[in-house]
């Protein structure tokens, strides 16, 4: 299935397309098909023309995913810098209709921002700062896009994505857009249930008004803290494991003596033990083997089973 099988497309469609450069680990095989939509409406056109049983995988910044060396079956859709609309919206608007009645959500005097899935969390944080919204600064510590943050309830510096969400837009396999509210989902620590073969394409975030200078100071302080504690600029996915209740994955890994542990060219970071680095030419298999080794070793030493935060996908 190539571009000749489609009409009206304005995006870019590739077959057998290498995926490593689209992930922050810089590893992984090829996608059978890879689509980079021009915008949200082009994505709708594309999806309406796909077979109903076509497997779909969505990528943003590729920062919380390990793509295996055998690649991905079906179609990979890249949202980064394609679903990129970011704006302040009316503080009270019609969000959806139910049984002929209009449901409203309101910011109660706060600021509501609509951000599409391909907007990076760093860009969302900077936009919040420009609007004087200090409580949105934590997004600067999330190394991904809005779509990924919504899908996993990403968080940083004590903030969590879904604490700020008052509504979302999702898209199904047929390209239909649905508007949904948080009460339709089960929100957990680094996990969201209730998507059911749909994909997040935009979020509505509600923030308190504040002083732009204070917001800028807050984001700078958070970024300084991150740069001191994390291996910024290295090939990693961010945190590999979720923090267990009452503890930290990094502390458990470090106390198990695993800092600097390597398999192939994958290595547990010396700076932050919950980061695994690609030292230059690691394979996805190297990284996955090290993830399993760390989890097994921590379980043996501490009796705690670490749960992966990173999503491992594709064929071995």
Swiss-Prot record:
Boundaries of every FAD-binding PCMH-type domain copy: 27-225
Would you tell me the protein name for this molecule?
UDP-N-acetylenolpyruvoylglucosamine reductase
Q: Which reaction does it catalyse?
A: UDP-N-acetyl-alpha-D-muramate + NADP(+) = UDP-N-acetyl-3-O-(1-carboxyvinyl)-alpha-D-glucosamine + NADPH + H(+)
- In what pathway does it function? Cell wall biogenesis; peptidoglycan biosynthesis
Concerning SUPFAM superfamilies, the annotation shows: FAD-binding/transporter-associated domain-like, Uridine diphospho-N-Acetylenolpyruvylglucosamine reductase, MurB, C-terminal domain
Q: Which GO terms describe its cellular component?
A: cytosol
Q: Where found in the cell? A: Cytoplasm
4Fe-4S among keywords: no
Query: Which is an annotated Pfam family here?
Result: MurB_C
What this chain does, per the record?
Cell wall formation.
Cross-referenced InterPro entries: FAD-bd_PCMH, FAD-bd_PCMH-like_sf, FAD-bd_PCMH_sub1, FAD-bd_PCMH_sub2, MurB, MurB_C, MurB_C_sf, Oxid_FAD_bind_N
Its Gene Ontology molecular function terms? FAD binding; UDP-N-acetylmuramate dehydrogenase activity
